[in-house]
């Protein structure tokens, strides 16, 4: 089946799920999102880009940004990150303080909030301006030089960052924070507030589908680094539902509470879906279902 027709079919199949779930309400600016919206885009390694539904509508990327900050730190050749952050699934909520205390300030993986704060902290040390460098990178890889930071979301998220502040201060108490906590939180909420469409996100995700090669053909990550990021996406990318996601979808994916999910079929394509209604674990209800349909209909999987 031709890809555009396939995406239209998937959009029709998940129609009953549009409006399901709950929008993220702990960030007031996200609580106003329309749960009925849905978009899907596929960017193929040979250059084809296809979409259906609200695939050009921008949304807050939130935790999906963690994929790219991790890539940027590893691209600097700085493997010291792995002394500060683990690579194991957490099995706990993404903002858990209990697990961080149990493991003495070392986050379980780079995609839970504590781990992502450590990655942003490391990127600040490496570049001086984590969010500025991330935004420039995403604008280039998405071929959209106008990608913005949604200031309304950033301000709202910063005003309700108590849990992330607690995580960062807790890590600092164990010596696992290099920069001032307030600076790290400021950069972190701004990186999460970058607004991208499914189209933009799928284009940017091709970095991992191409095994670390940028859109201009230059190498950015080694093949091994890209493989490892994809592996962590598969095992840790959908909060404490990673096992269910791997079982049903079967490809690496990273979700965000803005309702987006970036998924990678290595060597083939990057897929981005968006629908703001979330399940109790913080993953898009319609988005996960759409990716399940996508891998079932294409037969593409890493297994």
Swiss-Prot record:
Reaction it catalyzes: L-glutamine + H2O = L-glutamate + NH4(+)
Enzyme Commission no: 3.5.1.2
Residues where substrate binds: 63, 113, 157, 164, 188, 239, 257
Class in the EC hierarchy, top level: hydrolase
Keywords: Hydrolase
PANTHER family: GLUTAMINASE
Subunit and interaction comment: Homotetramer.
UniProt-recorded name of the protein: Glutaminase
Species for this entry: Saccharopolyspora erythraea (strain ATCC 11635 / DSM 40517 / JCM 4748 / NBRC 13426 / NCIMB 8594 / NRRL 2338)
Lineage: Bacteria, Bacillati, Actinomycetota, Actinomycetes, Pseudonocardiales
